[in-house]
Amino acid sequence: RGSKNNMNKPSVTISTNLSAQRVSRKFERQNIYSQGNSITAGYDPTSSMTWGPKISELANDPKYGGNMNNQYTATDGMHEGQYYNPKRAQAGLSGWTTPQIYDNVGDFLGTGFTENTNVNLSQSINGINYSFGVNNSHQNGIIPSTGMDRWGARGLVDWKINPQWNTGFSINYSSTKITSAPGANDGIMNVVYSAPAEYDLKGIPNHEPGNPTNQILFRSTSFTNPYWWAEHNEYLQHTNRAFGNTYLEYQPNLGLGENFSLKIREQAGLDIWTSDYATIREMGSTSSLLSLIHI
């Protein structure tokens, strides 16, 4: 029948963790004044500033208000309580809309999701301890189209050959793919944070009807609409890594009692990795006039 150690059975462990993430607190921003350089200058749907007239008074704006005589009411008739936004008309919607406040930050930032799964097999038998496992992590970021996927494998073996000799090895491998959001001049979060409170960043289509290469945004076209970016562009980082070590240990019997011992150990290890990066900008990206695939 053998010893008890010989009868140890393999142990299989499976674990999964799931979690969700939301932005717990957003910074306060003014939602009184509309897009424009100043109150006296009036509403300006091309301005990068949000110090125009009060949102509640947009219907009375001399140039765009539906309560006023201007080029838009001359064409479409009076629109009491509304104002005209040329960006809506460019997107194929009615240019006339009722002033209201939108949560552009909350609309853009979604719910993140994280999943971690581990499967492990281990056993101790005849002086050999081993453990092998695989794991997976998947994450969807709170910023649309961002996330991570990682697969990994691990092996560990320790072998007590006899009272004097021990050997073993460990090896780890991982493959990680990360899709991230751009920063600096190509950043999208600065566009989300700076969106005028009365501009429906989510609801207004991000490109002209039938022409996805012509973006629509509340400010100049040198900035990318974050929803357009999430649909068309990608920043990818892929890393493969392997590392581990092996050892051989000798402990001679010196016959000097338990308080004295000598161990001689030789060990070698490795750590290798490769990383590749891909930047994909489709035709219509504002940072370049042409589409770009950079690897």
Task: Label each residue range with its predicted role.
Residues 97-98, 180-243:
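Acidic/polar loop-and-plug regions of large Gram-negative outer-membrane beta-barrel proteins
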